[in-house]
Structure formats: C-alpha cells, structure tokens
C-alpha cells in the first residue's frame, strides 16, 4: 500500500506502520521542511518505508495518484490546497486537516484535526484496512470534485463565515 503525504508528523506515521505492515509513505514536493522530514525518518529507523520524490509535474503527479491508495494532507497552513482535489479527481480517497481551507468545501474527504495524530493514524488505518470504505470515499469524492464549481465553493465558505459571525454575536 502507498500513502501520499504532505506536512509534518512522525507519530502518526509510526502508528500506521505499527498497525499496517505493508504501508509505504510517498512524500512529494520540495520545501523548507523536506530536509527535516528526511532526517527525522532516518532517525526513527523507518526510512525504508518512505520514498521522497521531490517536485512532481504534469504526468508524474497523475502517475503517483494512480499508484496511491490514500492521499494525506495534514497541513495546518494550506489556505486552499489544490492537491486534494487532484487526488479526488484521480479516484484516491483523501484525508485532510480540518484547519486547511479546502476542508470547508469538501464533504467526501476524511477530516481530522491537525494536532490529533491518533485520529489521523486511525483514518489512514481505516482506509487501508477496509477497502469498501476507501472505494466509497474514492467514488463519492470523484463525483464531488467533478461537480465542484467555484461559485458553489464560495457559497459554502460564505455560509461558514456567516455562521461564525452569528455565533459570535450571540
């Protein structure tokens, strides 16, 4: 199994590796934190379970999604990440942090709090262990992202803001 991951967090990775023996993490991209992640994975002795691709473009991205069982974006600072939408369009079930901007728009992505490593590990474990669950999120996610329009996304975000303002005024 493979899991495409973005962001930090060593604990959930170790928890998943303890529960699912044949999982591999694929980390795509190149950023300020990548060197830290590579060193940390080596320190933990789990480097053999990781593949660091560097920056991917075009067809490479689609190929990576085709090889993935789960896409994980536990980012706390992603205003509106497009990569979860790309994963869903490729038929890959998606796990994102509630704190990411895209969480407000998507219904068929598993959402966990960025700091809740147990919930993140449980979500990955669930999708890898129960194929029917993964297939449901993949198919519903594909339907959702295919029908996603920016006007609908903006309306959802506007509703969230209105709810927050209304709660603050009460």
Residue ranges and their predicted role:
Residues 1-12:
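Single conserved hydrophobic/aromatic residue that forms the stacking wall/gate
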Residues 36-56:
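Nucleotide-activated donor-binding/catalytic signature segment of Leloir-type glycosyltransferases, i.e.
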Residues 55-56, 63-68:
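Short alpha-helical donor nucleotide-sugar binding micro-motif in glycosyltransferases
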Residues 76:
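Aromatic "clamp/platform" in nucleotide-sugar-dependent glycosyltransferases that forms part
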Residues 93-96:
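Short hydrophobic beta-strand element within catalytic cores of glycosyltransferases
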Residues 109-118, 126-131:
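Conserved acidic donor-binding segment of nucleotide-sugar-dependent glycosyltransferases
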Residues 132-162:
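A charged, aromatic-enriched C-terminal amphipathic alpha-helix characteristic of glycosyltransferases
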